[in-house]
Amino acid sequence: MRTIMLTGATGLIGEAFINLFSMPRNAKLILVARKKPDFELPKGVEVRIISDFFDEDALCEALRGGNEMICCIGTTIKKAGSKKAFEKTDVGIIELLAQCCSELDYDGFHYVSSIDSSIESKAFYLQCKGRAEMAIQLRKFKRISILRPSLLLGKRREFRLGEKIGMTFSAIFPFFLVGPLKRYRAIQADTVAKCLLYRSMSDNEDMMIFESEEIKTYTTLNINF
């Protein structure tokens, strides 16, 4: 039985991933978080509390015993309060997670990034996502998954105006997003979570980058998982 560690459990995708464990799985799920989620957890899901993700020793200790890392950590510049604070979370924490998981000989690291992420992007947000991706790829894991979803659909516990507007547009005018723009169509958080689960339960030894439409395709191909 493999042990999957999940960070970013209280976000939209993190919660969707947890809900997948309401069904029997040949795997153990452990959440590593600052506090226990305020929603009911499936039976058998463990929570390890860590007050400071920047305490490297404490972080590595909390991650001990895992095989696969599911990283759904991500905030917004508005919520973080500044670009510097955002960078500290969306790059700094991921760098430390990758380092600890590598030192603990994890087999896989699976990270939810963003569509159009690139270290060469002129957009600060997307550049940070690209840097986080690079920090993971530089480590020698057997399996690496980088997921780059477009706008996420689902019931988020926190209100994000930009996402709400985007969700409304995507629901009413999806036919505008055709050809090269098809990749920007919204995607269900549950679909992203399923892709993460399939990859974390895989025995493949590879590095895969999934653009938003590829996440949907991969999930469909593994529908009987």
Where are these regions (language model features)?
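Oxidoreductase cofactor-interface core, primarily capturing Rossmann-like NAD(P)-dependent enzymes
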Residues: 9, 24, 119-208, 213-219
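Active-site beta-alpha turn of Rossmann-fold NAD(P)-dependent dehydrogenases/reductases
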Residues: 73, 110-113, 150
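Short, catalytically relevant binding-site loops at active-site mouths
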Residues: 37, 76-77, 115-118, 152-153
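Conserved Rossmann-fold NAD(P)-dependent oxidoreductase catalytic core, especially the SDR/UDP-sugar
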Residues: 12, 30, 35, 81-83, ...
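Structural motif
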Residues: 3, 67-68, 108
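NAD(P)H-binding glycine-rich loop region in Rossmannoid oxidoreductase-like domains
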Residues: 37-38, 42-96, 100-103
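N-terminal Rossmann NAD(P)H-binding glycine-rich loop of SDR-like oxidoreductase domains
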Residues: 2-25
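Short glycine-/acidic-enriched loop or helix-start segments at secondary-structure transitions
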Residues: 15-17, 41, 80-81, 120-122, ...
